[in-house]
Structures are given as C-alpha cells and as structure tokens.
C-alpha cells in the first residue's frame, strides 16, 4: 500500500468515482476542478485553511483515553479522536472551511448545501456567515422533523432551509434538489457537498480537507503511546469522517482500518444503510459510480438508520475502492448496538456522542473485550450528540 495513489486524472478510484452528470454541469465541475488544482498547489491557500482550523474551529482536536470505558469492557484500550469538540460540534466544518475558501477564491457570492443530520447544513451556514456569503440548505422533510434544533441553528446563522418533499424525503432527495439548483445558478453559486461522494473532484477534495483528522491523530498517538493504534475505526455513511481518519493510515500496514456502516434493523432486512456489508451492486447516483443499494431494475432502494447522517444508499467511491483492494474492512453496527454504545459512553466517560459516531463506538464495545489489554483501538468520535437527544428520548419513551 506504500504506492497508493487515487484518484486518477478522470476522478476514478479503481472502478469507482468519475463524473456522471448532465452536460449542463460539466463546465461547472471543470471550473471547480481547475480552481481546486490551482488552490492545491498554492501554499497561501493552505495557510489560510490552517489558520481558520486553528483560530476558528479550535484545532487540533485532542485524542482522549476512554480509560473507564476500556476498564469496564476489559480488553483493548479505547482512545477517541475528539472531532465532537470542534466548533459546530462535528468533523463537517473541516470540509466546509476548505470549500468556502475555494468559493471565495472563485468569486462566488452564494453557497448551497445538502444535509441529512443537519451537521453539514450548520457547518455550511457557519462558514457562509464567516465569509459573508448567502446560503441555502436543502434538507429532506423527514430529516427536518428529526433534527429541529439544527434547523433552527441554520436559520439563526442566516441560512435559508429548503424542505425537500420528494422521494424518501431524506438526504438522497436533498442532494438531488441541491444539484438541480446548482445547474440553474452555476454562475454565482458554489455547491458545498458535505461528504466524500458526488462527482469528481468532490470525493478527492473533501478527503483532502478531512485528512487533518488522521494527520493529527498519527502525531498525537505517537506522542501519547509511542506508537500507532492497532485498529482505527470510524462510522461510514458517505464516508468523509472515515476517509479523513483512514487516508493518512493507508501506508501504515500494521494499522487495521475498520469502517462501520449503519446496520439499521439488520442487513438481512430491508431496513439498513449498508451498501458494502449487504453486498450491494455497483450503480450510479449523484454523479459518481460506487456500491449502491438498488433493486433488480436499478432503482435506488429506501434506507433506514437511527442516525440521519448515515441514512444514505450509497458510499463514497474511495471507500468502495479500499474495500475492493482489501485495505479497509467494512462491517455494520445495528440501531440497538449504536444506542447501547451511546449510553455507555455517556455513563462511563461523560461524553454524549452523535448517533452516527456511536456506530463506531459500538464496534469498539463489541471487539475490545476480544483483544489484549495492551492493544489500542482509536475511534473517530466524529460528532457530539446534542442534536440526537430528542431521537434518543423518543426511543426510550421519554417526553421532553
């Protein structure tokens, strides 16, 4: 894996990725690819990016030894990469800062975004306020109901939230609408995609901005324990927090990488969002080719997860490629396992995790007891759980 280079010049990671969009979007994506290529080679761009990550986001985010949880489970030592401590409460802002700086560089006055859990919507509204741009956020009507606190946050930050009533009224449909809007207003509008998916150059660009997670973690773990973890684990929906942790570790062959998809009610039921674990075929959605939950006629299937942010039928193309070349293992945590992990982290560490991140914690909860006390699991705690309090209370039958 020392020679891992992806994507190629056409935006493909092996057989995944690429550019599957209508003719009308090609010029916009070409303009974006050219602008990103120029920015990528400009030290001043990265200087501005690092400045905002430090002074605005509050990076570096620490790594934390979850000693009480580790002791309770008996087995491997669990460490957390604390992305929940970033400004706006999740990893999403790493990417929105980068894309907003690029939008500014390109002279765009307006940004649009899609959001599921609302975290990316909040992070996009935040950077729009920070850089003086107008912002429209597209959000499925069902997700709006699930994530009212984040909807209000976006409005407080000056964004306009557009409810999407079509299809399953979730993230997939919000992304469809945002892409339609981008086609119509490409001259003055920059589309901030929130995950490591979409047409090229988005998967590469989002990954590059999120790699700050893994780069920091490598230096921090070396300092904290004198070596790298035995396992690095992250939840995977579209997969931006996971690729940000994994990518810097791809060349470290003694570090096992584990991506945890949303198992929902079980991959043997229709109610999950686990394209890789369920053996979904390759399909095209939102401008890229990847494993995609679909029926025998190629129609995209409905998904289910207790966490709005993992409720997506596809997966970022680089994850599909890393699965194909067997560098990353993909598995699932079911709703009930994620909820149990959520409770355990609250009780033993005083940390309320996002339900998305709880899927990664669930893998650690399940596997730490099978490992030695001298082994180390690094969990990417991708976000905090304030936004999920209503969902968890409802599931427990508690009225707030």
Swiss-Prot record:
Protein name per its UniProtKB record: Tryptophan synthase beta chain
Residues modified as N6-(pyridoxal phosphate)lysine: 92
Subunit structure, interactors included: Tetramer of two alpha and two beta chains.
UniProt-listed Enzyme Commission number(s): 4.2.1.20
Catalytic activity entry: (1S,2R)-1-C-(indol-3-yl)glycerol 3-phosphate + L-serine = D-glyceraldehyde 3-phosphate + L-tryptophan + H2O
Function: The beta subunit is responsible for the synthesis of L-tryptophan from indole and L-serine.
GO cellular component, one term: cytoplasm
Protein's GO biological process: L-tryptophan biosynthetic process
Cofactor names: pyridoxal 5'-phosphate
Family statement: Belongs to the TrpB family.
Pfam families assigned: PALP
Organism: Neisseria meningitidis serogroup B (strain ATCC BAA-335 / MC58)
């Amino acid at each position: 894996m020392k020679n891992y280079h992806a994507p190629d010049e056409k935006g493909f990671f092996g057989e995944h990725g690429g550019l599957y969009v209508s003719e009308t979007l090609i010029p916009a994506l070409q303009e974006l690819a050219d602008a990103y290529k120029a920015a990528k080679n400009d030290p001043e761009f990265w200087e501005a990016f690092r400045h905002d990550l430090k002074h605005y986001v509050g990076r570096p985010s620490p790594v934390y030894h979850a000693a009480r949880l580790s002791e309770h489970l008996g087995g491997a030592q669990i460490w957390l990469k604390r992305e929940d401590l970033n400004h706006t409460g999740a990893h999403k802002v790493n990417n929105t800062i980068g894309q907003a700086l690029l939008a500014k560089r390109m002279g765009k006055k307006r940004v649009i975004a899609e959001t599921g859990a609302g975290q990316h919507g909040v992070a996009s509204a935040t950077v729009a306020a920070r850089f003086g741009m107008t912002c429209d956020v597209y959000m499925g009507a069902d997700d709006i109901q699930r994530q009212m606190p984040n909807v209000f946050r976006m409005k407080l930050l000056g964004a306009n939230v557009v409810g999407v009533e079509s299809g399953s009224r979730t993230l997939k449909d919000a992304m469809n609408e945002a892409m339609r809007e981008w086609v119509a207003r490409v001259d003055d509008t920059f589309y901030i995609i929130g995950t490591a998916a979409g047409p090229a150059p988005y998967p590469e660009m989002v990954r590059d901005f999120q790699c700050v997670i893994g780069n920091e973690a490598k230096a921090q773990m070396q300092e904290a324990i004198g070596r790298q973890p035995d396992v690095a684990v992250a939840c995977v929906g579209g997969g931006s927090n996971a690729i940000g942790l994994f990518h810097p570790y791809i060349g470290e062959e003694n570090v096992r990488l584990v991506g945890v998809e949303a198992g929902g009610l079980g991959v043997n039921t229709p109610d999950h969002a686990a394209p890789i674990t369920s053996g979904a075929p390759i399909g095209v959605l939102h401008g890229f080719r990847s494993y995609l939950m679909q029926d025998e006629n190629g129609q995209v299937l409905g998904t289910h997860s207790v966490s709005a942010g993992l409720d997506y039928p596809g997966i970022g193309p680089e994850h599909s490629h890393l699965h194909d070349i067997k560098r990353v293992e993909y598995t699932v945590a079911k709703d009930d396992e994620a909820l149990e992990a959520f409770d355990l982290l609250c009780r033993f560490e005083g940390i309320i995790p996002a339900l998305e991140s709880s899927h990664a914690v669930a893998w650690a909860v399940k596997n730490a007891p099978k490992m030695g006390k001298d082994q180390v699991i690094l969990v990417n705690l991708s976000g905090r759980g304030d936004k999920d309090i209503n969902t968890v209370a409802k599931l427990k039958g508690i009225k707030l």
